Amino acid sequence: MKKIILLSFLFLFVSEGIYAAIGKKNKKKVTNPIEVKKDSVNADYKKVTKDAVIKQGLFTTFLSKKENNLYFEIPDSAFSHTYLLTNRIAETSNTHDYVAGQMATNPLMIRFSKDGQKVYMHLVQSSNMVDQNDPIASAFNKNFADPVLKGFKIVARNQGNVVIDVTSFFGGNEKCISPIKQESPLAKLFGGGNSLKGTFAADASNILSVKTFPNNIEIKSLLSFTTTPLNQPYSVTVHRSLFVLPDTLMAMRLQDNRVGYFSSDKSLYTSSKDKIIPQTFIHRWRIEPKKQDLERYFKGELVEPMKPIVFYVDTAFPEKWRTVVKQGIEDWNMAFEAAGFKNVVKALDYPSNNPDFDPDDMRYSCVKYAATSIANAMGPSHIDPRTGEILTADVIWYHNVISLLHNWRFVQTAAVDDRVRKAVFDDDVMQEAIRYAAAHEIGHTLGLMHNMGASYSFPVDSLRSPKFTQKYGTTPSIMDYARNNYIAQPGDLEKGVKLTPPNLGVYDIYAIDWGYRLIPGADTPEKEKTVLDAWIEKKKSDPMYEFGAQQVFGTVDPTDQSEDLGDDHLKAGDLAIRNLKVIMKNLETWTFDKGARYDEVENMYIEVVRQYTRHLRHVMPYVGGIRFQEVRQGEDSSAKNYIDKATQKKAV
């Protein structure tokens, strides 16, 4: 801005001298120079827009054809909004750290401010809160200011708008959105520290494209690196989304340890309490009735949401798998019906007739197929940090998860089910496994955590009951790591015993109801709490509705374990090992392929050993184990109970 003012001053000064000289010579009256308005279109703006591809939307963007520089023209109104900036991998030459479709960094909540010379990008803090009408608000605001993440020089003006050059931010290796993982010094202690490292190659990097829409801007850039110490090239196409967050905030719901939701912690500063109030709010989608249906909803009628949750399924999935992936997605409608909504979750193929569709665009939630050797799937979601509202979500489906599903089904049920005694399952068997895996990951995208204690609520003997298993499957929650029925014995399948998890468990339906049902007359999270507590109290006596948190750093509570079934791991393990002995006796016969190497036999032998080891590990936590329970004041029970001596001796 100083340069612009200085140039204007010099221009006026020189012009006045020229006109004075002419006046003396020609004796003509000198006219006053035209005043240049501060916010008028200037020469710098014309320079920026010349030969640029101009797109209008959230901001007007200019991508110059020659230099490939990217400019944002930011209207004055934009400085009153809050935004989310996401950073996703669109393509990669190396899947060591990321696969295509995966978020490379956590989304950043940002806002913009400006002065006479610069536009500042601030990182907005949301973990501390205050009511702006509280007397302490002014002091709070001074002590929790939003730090500046980046400053951009104003290079031009257009009336009330300012123009900034964002080329280096989106086309360079900006640390806060770099595809090179930033690791903490403690990473190696927890199995990390092996991420790719490299030197940015600016000459092999570029901004590829920009798309601008009313509420978002989508930018693709090619970033290249030379990795160390092997000196290998590494290139990624990154997709950045700048998305304006809603001005009307979603109603927040307080988290409760007795129902497993992902959540965000906040600290409430207030002058009405004697301390800072810690609060935790669940992550959930904004599922609300249409205004005209609100009365019907509170009368108990099923209504459609104002905005459904739509998942687009990658057409890279083989058709025979894509169909059941979509079924697994829409299985969750049963749970939302319990909360009073119908047709909440929809599954569609990637659209072929929408030129604006991009699976990396923040507006679209997608199930993406990643052709890698990783044997896994994951379902991350991305929230408005202010409220916990889930804005978008993805399921990353790694190609080799198929081998994981195959191996589980073989080692857990081959002793009782002759359909899985082969290297390649029939379509109907694999489709059942895929549907379960898809539904599990969608559960995460809806806000649900793993419920590792769910399967412990089932008596071991019940898992050999046709009536019980046909009704409940292997677990009351598909958010548990409770796979296939390894407790069933030869002959049980023919009697009608079910070998697989349910489409949804009773806990899953209950949890969605608890998290998404609207409560009439409760206009604050605190007013909801009494009703939410009553819903939990109603189910308290039934262990099927208990939540067991995942134990990450070692298993202390034997009732909250992964890959387990039933309420007696010793008895369940004995039955399971009987089945493993049957499999070992027939392994070569069931995997026989004349003329083939023994690779498949060896692989399945390893899988049997792994399954055997799981059963041993399920018993180990009983020795010195503690059962934890979420207890509230006034309840006649203990928060922790040591495993009794007799059970510990039996486990040994």
Set out the residue ranges of the language-model regions.
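Bacterial Sec-dependent N-terminal signal peptides
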Residues: 1-24
